[in-house]
UniProtKB/Swiss-Prot annotation:
Subcellular location field: Plastid, Chloroplast thylakoid membrane
Protein name: Photosystem II reaction center protein T
GO cellular component: chloroplast thylakoid membrane; photosystem II reaction center
Keywords: Chloroplast, Membrane, Photosynthesis, Photosystem II, Plastid, Thylakoid, Transmembrane, Transmembrane helix
Phylogenetic classification of the source organism: Eukaryota, Viridiplantae, Streptophyta, Embryophyta, Tracheophyta
Keyword Plastid part of the UniProt annotation: yes
Similarity comment: family membership: Belongs to the PsbT family.
SUPFAM superfamilies per record: Photosystem II reaction center protein T, PsbT
GO terms under biological process: photosynthesis
Length: 35
């Protein structure tokens, strides 16, 4: 069960960092169609 908690924390941290970098930089990716 501890592994699930650590995985959740890891994903949450990566998600926060990803969103922080994504919102900090200008959204150039939205101009192109990314699939």
């Amino acid at each position: 069960m501890e592994a699930l908690v650590y995985t959740f924390l890891l994903v949450s941290t990566l998600g926060i960092i990803f969103f922080a970098i994504f919102f900090r930089e200008p959204p150039k990716i939205q101009t192109k169609k990314m699939k």
